[in-house]
């Protein structure tokens, strides 16, 4: 045991004794986690303070995001400090297995790829010694904790801080006030350290928690009006109670607007306070020192809010306007027009009247600047937040090459015609530290022997693996993959009660549940395979486990119906004795970052099946590629670049291209595909014909495919159009898997080609091309 690890263990023991009168051997995993976290926070505090002091005088970038999917921090922090293995051994000497911390809750601060991207970016910035600070919200209960009851999604509050939150520092003295039309709230920052890998830099993620100015109305309490006594407290805390509150009602929309305004106003007040401390009150120099990146449009209210704050400091509107448009840059994350955020002016006026007025003034300025164009920010009584972000930013970027091209050619083509210099591409990336080093140490052992150390900071070094993919290397890789499958089987049996066979192909689709991500296509295809195996039309089939993981938004009926249908398909197949040794289906509950760390290294097939032109990029595809899964996917998002890097012969690409979809879309007749394809028809009919139990929501899915639903046209996302192509690709990968050496070589080519998809590369490009910041050591 080294002196350092011995000190950590002793301090942890001392804290447990002081706080709980317990020994290491007597304590619970939760209390061990809290004590160890506090000790590590003390150990890094000096580097954290030094980092802040080094970065404060210079130019800095700030990342505004509604989500940060940071996952479980204890292992990743120990890993980035370079002491994970050492600490496991040190605690083992005391009879304590740090694997007990596997049961610690993930921090419930995000949901999908948007939040995980933000977390990866902060990790990369700290590792590269870049002055990037994250700002977000500290949600008391996150999105929700998912479970299945009778196959249906159930949502429960995710009480992730129930046993403490040792990785945050509450900073009361830095609290700020945020005013709405009907209330004023205290916003208290909680700082999370972002520990760089193999560096002394410790970045900061600052999260705001809303609290009441007055915790208790004592007069109301004495008058025994207990509801009124706590009314202000509850109303304030509601703002940061959950991520993405249901906004199907007026009050729900007001709460969403309040969330977004708190993120914007509190963060900007904090930034301006630091600016004044370092540079005084000469706000005309603000763009020299400050760059703010908007991660999608949730923080877009920052634009009018900065104008408002500068005007409150004495600047006139025109001066504040010109300064503001030199501070912000905007990352777009969707190509679907219906997903672009817009707010009714009446709604904004009822919550943030001053901000609403400034948005209208910005719109007037735009129309004055470009009187002969169709550009707008306000239209039909609505503020279009993406348009506001494009107009007021120095740079606008997509997150994959195909996505960025669609922004220029379609979504923002009128803006691109006037501001072509603003539009850039920054293909997303993932941190190799968490998604390879931490989650797959077995594969790292093989890579160390082939390309040497260093690839976790310079992922393009994996390219050197290509020359050495011989039969022995493939066999070593296959053995590692089998071990990761065995590990996942144990996790799934513990959490889901489903026993999987690790010798099966592991076919994985894990991502947010949305119709455009086409989990329903996957499920219908599985049903088709099942029925075809049963009737003998498919005779040779390599045994496969189909693994799903996804949460559906609480108010998204059809997404929840898809989950229920997948679970019904799973019940049918898993209870059929004829499918023993042939096929299994499992939908894991409460899929999150920590579950992903088990699933992704075990996957053989990465399902990336959204219709071309709908997924901005995706990052799950990159994580799966890095861990040696082949992509079964469309030419959408980053799939295009994955196939370019690894070679299309090492992926399984299917489906219509963007150009083909645009060509067929105007006259697309879903019913004609349904009628012409008996296998498709048989699979789709299982939604309603009693093959599996059905209900009103499942009938709605069926109707949405054949007749349309709400604003959707029939088969809005072209499941029928791509059905046969998907089936052929799926059967091809199923057949190819039998040649374990040839298939293993494809997998290793994916690992060796993943260098481009490091978030280190992405962050370097943001730093150089958009934020104009350099490393500060």
Positions of predicted regions on the chain:
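A conserved ligand/cofactor-binding region detector
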Residues: 1-777
């Amino acid at each position: 045991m080294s002196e350092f690890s011995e000190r950590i263990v002793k301090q942890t023991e001392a804290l447990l004794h002081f706080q709980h009168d317990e020994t290491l051997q007597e304590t619970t995993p939760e209390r061990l986690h809290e004590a160890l976290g506090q000790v590590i926070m003390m150990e890094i505090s000096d580097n954290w303070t030094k980092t802040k002091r080094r970065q404060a005088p210079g130019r800095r970038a700030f990342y505004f995001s509604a989500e940060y999917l940071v996952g479980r921090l204890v292992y990743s922090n120990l890993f980035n400090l370079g002491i994970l293995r050492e600490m496991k051994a040190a605690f083992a000497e005391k009879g304590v297995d740090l694997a007990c911390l596997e049961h610690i809750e993930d921090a419930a601060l995000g949901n999908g790829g948007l939040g995980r991207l933000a977390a990866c970016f902060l990790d990369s910035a700290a590792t590269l010694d870049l002055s990037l600070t994250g700002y977000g919200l500290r949600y008391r209960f996150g999105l929700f904790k998912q479970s299945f009851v009778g196959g249906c999604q159930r949502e429960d509050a995710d009480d992730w801080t129930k046993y403490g939150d040792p990785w945050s520092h509450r900073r009361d003295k830095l609290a700020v006030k945020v005013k709405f039309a009907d209330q004023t709230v205290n916003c208290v920052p909680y700082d999370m350290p972002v520990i760089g890998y193999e560096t002394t830099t410790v970045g900061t993620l600052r999260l705001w928690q809303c609290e009441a100015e007055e915790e208790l109305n004592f007069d109301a309490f004495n008058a025994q009006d207990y509801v009124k006594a706590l009314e202000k407290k509850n109303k304030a805390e509601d703002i940061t109670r959950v991520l993405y509150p249901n906004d199907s009602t007026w009050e729900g929309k007001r709460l969403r607007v309040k969330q977004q305004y708190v993120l914007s106003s509190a963060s900007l007040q904090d930034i301006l306070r630091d600016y004044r401390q370092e540079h005084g009150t000469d706000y005309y120099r603000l763009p020299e020192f400050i760059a703010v990146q908007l991660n999608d449009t949730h923080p877009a209210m920052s634009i009018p809010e900065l104008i408002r704050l500068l005007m409150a400091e004495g600047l006139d509107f025109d001066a504040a306007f010109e300064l503001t448009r030199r501070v912000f840059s905007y990352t777009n994350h969707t190509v679907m027009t219906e997903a672009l955020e817009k707010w009714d002016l009446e709604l904004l006026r009822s919550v943030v009247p001053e901000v609403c007025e400034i948005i209208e003034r910005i719109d007037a300025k735009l129309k004055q600047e470009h009187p002969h164009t169709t550009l707008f920010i306000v239209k039909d009584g609505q503020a279009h937040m993406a348009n506001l972000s494009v107009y007021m930013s120095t740079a606008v970027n997509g997150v994959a090459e195909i996505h960025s091209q669609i922004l220029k050619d379609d979504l923002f083509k009128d803006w691109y015609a006037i501001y072509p210099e603003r539009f850039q591409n920054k293909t997303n990336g993932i941190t190799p530290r968490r998604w390879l080093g931490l989650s797959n140490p077995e594969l790292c052992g093989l890579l160390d022997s082939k390309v040497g150390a260093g690839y976790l900071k310079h992922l393009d070094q994996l390219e050197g693996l290509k020359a050495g993919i011989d039969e022995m290397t493939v066999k070593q890789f296959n053995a590692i993959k089998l071990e990761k499958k065995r590990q996942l089987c144990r996790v799934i049996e513990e959490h889901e009660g489903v026993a999987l066979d690790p010798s099966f192909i592991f076919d994985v689709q894990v991502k947010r549940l949305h119709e455009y991500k086409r989990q329903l296509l996957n499920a219908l295809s599985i049903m088709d395979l099942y029925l075809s195996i049963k009737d003998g039309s498919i005779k040779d089939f390599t045994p496969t486990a189909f693994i799903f993981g996804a949460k559906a938004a609480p108010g998204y009926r059809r997404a929840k119906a898809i989950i229920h249908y997948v679970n019904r398909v799973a019940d049918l197949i898993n209870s059929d004795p004829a499918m023993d040794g042939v096929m299994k289906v499992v939908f894991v509950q409460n899929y999150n970052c920590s579950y992903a760390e088990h699933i992704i290294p075990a996957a053989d097939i990465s399902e990336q099946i959204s219709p071309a032109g709908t997924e901005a990029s995706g990052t799950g595809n990159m994580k799966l590629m890095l861990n040696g899964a082949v992509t079964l996917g469309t030419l959408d998002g980053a799939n295009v670049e994955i196939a370019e890097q690894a070679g299309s012969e090492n992926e399984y690409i299917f489906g219509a291209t963007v150009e083909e979809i645009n060509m067929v879309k105007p006259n697309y007749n879903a019913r004609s595909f349904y009628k012409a394809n008996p296998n498709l028809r048989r699979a789709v009919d299982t939604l309603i014909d009693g093959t599996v139990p059905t209900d009103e929501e499942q009938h709605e899915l069926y109707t949405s495919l054949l007749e349309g639903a709400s604003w959707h046209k029939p088969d809005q996302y072209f499941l029928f159009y791509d059905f046969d192509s998907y089936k052929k690709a799926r059967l091809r990968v199923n057949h190819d898997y039998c040649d374990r050496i040839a298939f293993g070589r494809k997998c290793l080519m994916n690992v060796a080609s993943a260098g481009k998809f490091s978030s280190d590369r992405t962050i370097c490009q943001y730093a150089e091309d958009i934020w104009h910041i350099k490393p500060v050591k």
